Amino acid sequence: MEAIVFDRFGGPEALAPRTVADVHAGPGQVRIKVAAAGVNPIDGKIRSGAMQQFIPTQLPAVPGIDVAGVVDEVGEGVADVVVGDEVLGWAESGSYAEYAVASQVVRKPAGLSWEQAAALPVAGETAQRVLDLLGVTAGETLLVNGAAGAVGSLAVQLAAAAGVTVVGTASEANHAYVRELGASAVVTYGEGLAARVREVAPQGVDAVYDTAGHGALPDAIELLGGTTDRVITIADQAAESLGVVFSGGGTVEPRPALAEQARLVAEGRLRVRVAEVLPLGQAQKAHEISDGGHARGKLVLTP
């Protein structure tokens, strides 16, 4: 099968198209003919070797976690999907390929495009997981750092829908977009963040969800009066040195939440913004954009 492969750790230039051995569904897995693959910042961090301590990767490797496509092979013990089902989920063999295997998938609603489907699994799970860990409730104020990105934009919507007052950070060009998602106020990230947040939220914030890094954790801690128990980052590896929780994955069964989010997107009640769709052969370009950190929404690759 055709796939994108990296056989060394490095920049986007480490990615190259290659013919590799076909993958097949094992027990509890399905094989998916890939219709679209989502690109996540974590893909670039794995490719660069920065995540080797946390997610050991054996080279050569096919990148990609988000996958959407049609089931064409079902492994032993799988009872909830059949060959021909349209699904989305988390690839275990790398999704930047003709075929991928996965054990965690849900059926794709008819109203959901392939591109939207591929944009949802990682971002949706991450957004909901950290909101649950923070325990934000109606009436509280949440600061979302990186509110225009794939994870941040979903976190803003999910929190606002639950009655949480959301303050988002984004570049100036994305302020209006973040307000459309449900944020009560938006400020520009960077130096002086704490002061800008206080201007728009003089009552303070109750929790901080850092999806983007950009050195925001010291400001987040300052805004919470020096405490770190309600600050969580998914992007800043300096978290441990600051006493902040770095959330890199969950232990809760993710499929029910994904199925619900997919339904909401299909019904137009939750927005998944696809920033750009590129052919699989341009995975290197997609990683260059993703590594830059300014995509408004999700990058998606299609065969």
What is each of the regions a protein language model found here?
Residues G11-A14, T19-A68:
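N-terminal glycine-rich beta->alpha transition that marks the start or flank
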Residues A68-A91:
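A glycine-/small-residue-rich N-terminal strand-loop-strand element
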Residues V82, A110-S113, G135-T141:
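Short helix-loop-beta connector
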Residues L120, G124-E191:
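Mid-domain Rossmann-like dinucleotide-binding core that forms the NAD(H)/NADP(H) cofactor-binding site
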Residues G192-Q203:
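Short amphipathic alpha-helix with an adjacent loop that forms part of the alpha/beta core around
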Residues T211-R273, L280, P303:
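Glycine-rich phosphate-binding loop and adjacent beta-alpha segment
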Residues R269-R273, H287-P303:
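C-terminal capping/lid region of NAD(P)-dependent oxidoreductase domains
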